[in-house]
């Protein structure tokens, strides 16, 4: 049980590291170029999906840090209510990070390929550093989402090991 708890803490720290690194790449990335004698600056604020991803990353990193803190000071709990809450929040965080990252990837693909119908120019021919950093941030977010799926499976194990395999929704100790 101690190894499982250590694994959970290490996973949460890795998730926080990848998410904060991705947030720094998204939030601090901007590039200015002169196009047709006009200075054009591009940043994450022009792509709403990237801005939403930044806010999602901050909330999920804070949640994981709070969970690390609660696990650090909390004694083993015998009831299932906090474990259910942790399981549901871990699931929600994993889904939200994956959905936000997928939306940011789709929006970024529009920036890479452009769209004549929407009159979007291909930014990556002009702003290559910006595009490479956004691509790196999206890859880091997908790694964090995969780690969060693994973490939510550990959370599910911690929850469902409390229940009896023979009686539906009965604790092992009560059977």
Swiss-Prot record:
Compartment(s) of residence: Cell membrane
Cystine crosslinks: none
An example Gene Ontology CC term for this record: plasma membrane
InterPro entries: CASP/CASPL, CASP_dom
Principal subcellular localization: membrane
Membrane topology of this protein: Multi-pass membrane protein
Entry coiled-coil feature ranges: none
PANTHER family in alphabetical order: CASP-LIKE PROTEIN 2C1-RELATED (PTHR33573:SF30), CASP-LIKE PROTEIN 4A4 (PTHR33573)
Protein known as: CASP-like protein 2C1
């Amino acid at each position: 049980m101690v190894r499982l708890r250590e694994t959970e803490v290490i996973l949460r720290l890795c998730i926080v590291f990848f998410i904060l690194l991705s947030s720094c790449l998204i939030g601090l990335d901007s590039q200015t170029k002169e196009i047709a004698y006009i200075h054009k600056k591009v940043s994450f604020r022009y792509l709403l999906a990237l801005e939403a991803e930044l806010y999602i990353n901050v909330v999920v990193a804070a949640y994981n840090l709070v969970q690390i803190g609660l696990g650090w000071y909390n004694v083993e709990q015998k009831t299932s209510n906090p474990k259910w809450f942790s399981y549901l929040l871990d699931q929600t965080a994993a889904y939200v990070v994956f959905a936000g990252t997928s939306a940011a990837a789709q929006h970024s693909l529009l920036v890479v390929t452009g769209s004549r119908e929407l009159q979007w120019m291909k930014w990556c021919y002009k702003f290559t550093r910006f595009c490479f950093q956004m691509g790196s941030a999206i890859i880091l977010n997908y790694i964090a989402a995969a780690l969060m799926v693994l973490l939510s499976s550990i959370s599910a194990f911690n929850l469902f090991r409390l229940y009896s395999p023979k009686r539906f929704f009965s604790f092992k100790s009560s059977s």
